Amino acid sequence: MMKKTLALTALACLISAPVMAKTWVLTSAESATDLGNWKVTSNMLKVKNQNFSIEQKVLHGGKQEGSKVIIITSKDGLTITLSPSRGMNLLRVEGYGVRMGWDSPVKEVVNPAFMNLESRNGLGWLEGFNEMMVRCGYEWTGHPVTADGQIYTLHGKAGNTPASQVEVEVSDSAPYEIRVRGLVKESTFKKADLQTMTELRYVPGSNRFALHDVLTNHADYPHDYQIIYHSNFGKPILEAGARFIAPMESISPFNDYAKAGLKEWQNFAGPTKGFDEMVFNIKPLADENHHTTAAVINKAGDKGAAIQFDTRQLPVLTLWKNTDTEKQGYVTGIEPGTSYAYPVTIEREQKRVKQLQAGQSTQFDLTYTLLHTSGQVDDVVKKIGEIQGSTPIEEIETPIAKE
């Protein structure tokens, strides 16, 4: 009996014991500290069975003067580049001969200090847009509109807000999970005090990473929120004959221009001059755990990018097909969100804008997987097929709104 009790006590201790980790604070607005150029490696941490590094670089020149990037490099896995200066956005992810990301005419990591989001009638956001993943929100998102005595600029402000607190954490034991956290504040006197603790989680050697973001309303009053995880992919995944796959209840064109592409929503053209962009609104299906997956896969079916998300947190999905010329920006977007990309005025009317009470928090969990073998692609195709089941996809020809 004594041995059994001791064994149970030991097991309880193991279950309740916190995971030990080393933490570095790279930036803190509260304590006015910034480590600037900084690096830690698996060798420095005396990790023997993994080869990885985490580095922060301060950039110089042009409109990226003073911008910071953090680069996670795993020799047998992914290289993930994100920017604390730009709302902890992900610039690109590379590994196994595949890239998640795209080639924008914007080549620099533009410092928000040089941005004017209200320029070009609310389209200033485009002057810095080159990321693999941008958080479009959280106070509002979508196309610009003037209402309520203000300009709601394109896709909100979070993606152009430098993080106030940036931390890197590495677990002390296998599998040595890396976490990069950044606190993004949208705080305006009399308007809002929304704060998002963003977190990227990556296990060295893996072909996937996760985002775990917690949005909190720090004000004494309720406040609306919206978010679109604008996730963008170009070559080598995107090409003529590439395909988009996702389980869905319905799909409809965003506007009249996209009507012409409705029957070909699943297929991508090569770079096409004058194509501009077509956008489609999707109502996704999910499994019994409310999880769903959307993916873009190349023509051969041996490369791709998949995003898993929770439809309780992110109930709608936008497909953005921008298969214009390569210099203009040959890219597609898979965009889980609380809203579609219509202006906030339309999203309010159609009751997709959500609200947080004073002091309330909500969270968003997404997993991104870089697919680099036909077997991995087949697994995702099978998973999506199982969620779709026998449910027919309804192709709705009329846009649900008109700007």
What are these regions (language model features)?
Residues 230:
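An amphipathic, aromatic/His-enriched active-site/gating alpha helix that lines ligand/cofactor pockets
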Residues 16-18:
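N-terminal signal peptide c-region/cleavage motif recognized by signal peptidases
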Residues 5-14:
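Sec-dependent N-terminal signal peptides
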Residues 22-210, 222-224, 233-271, 283-403:
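Surface-exposed acidic/polar loop and edge beta-strand patches at domain peripheries
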Residues 1-2:
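N-terminal secretory signal peptides that target proteins for export/translocation
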